[in-house]
Amino acid sequence: MLANIANRIFPSEADALRPRLACEITSAGVVAARPGAAEQEIVSSFAPLRPGVLAGGLKPPNFTDRAIVAAALRQALDEISEKAGQVTVIIPDAAVRVLLLDFDVLPAKQAEALPIIRFRLRKLVPFEVEDAAISYQLMTSGAGMVRVIVAVVPAAVLAEYESAVREAGYEPGVVLPSTLAALAAISGDEPALVVNRNGSSVTTAITRQNELLLHRTLELTEKDWLPDENAYHSAEELQQSVSVAMAYFEDTLQAPPRQLLSCGLGGPEELIRLLGGDYIMVRDLVPTPFSTKAMPAGILAGVVGALAS
């Protein structure tokens, strides 16, 4: 499992353990979860957001109305939590940059490695990195090369999400990007190709055992076109993004993917529709027990992954 990849992306200095309460802020609403009494049981809840309230991105504001987001957080978390406390907060991939970086060498001590990583990021991300929240984890090392996964979020954007959680009466203990959180829900060691749709972005990721081979987020087209035109161009971009990931999977692993693991709004049925056919098997990374207006399909992977370790 990939729980260690997502384990401490943006750690809280006050708490060395992942909170046993998690929530994800999506364009459809806030989903919250905690472990149940039985083994592997997950207790979950959902509070909807009206369209347009969340606009995840690298520039603030990400919310058109923070009070509405805070109210949805409070509703979802209060429904399953007996008392306020620390919570793992999962934010849209579009609000974070996740990169795989190679170095000839990298110091073992974080205090020495972080300035080197920060210097590299200056040329790779379209925002100021001096005060950005940065976390990294060693992926592989050997043969004169060190590969790390790096997650970086602008300080103002991170503060916006944390403020909404605090306004809801909870304390953000760990903040995770959506797909990295969801990857921890993968079971088994077989290579996996994950497609995560959240609002106006799509992320494709490839894993092999505890190694992340690809993480690519694409913001889908939203222009001043008619709704049908926007939908057409977004579907076309999603198809292209998935095709590129499938080709990378086959080139890297010398075999085509047997299936796509879907997470994000709409579940596998919606992903199949957008891809324009069932030429490859698509299944839920984490199936929704029942899909209703109260709990949309495909929305549980992030919180389940966040609770996996």
Give residue ranges: language-model regions.
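Hydrophobic/aromatic-enriched cytosolic interaction surfaces used to assemble or bind macromolecules
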Residues: M1-S309
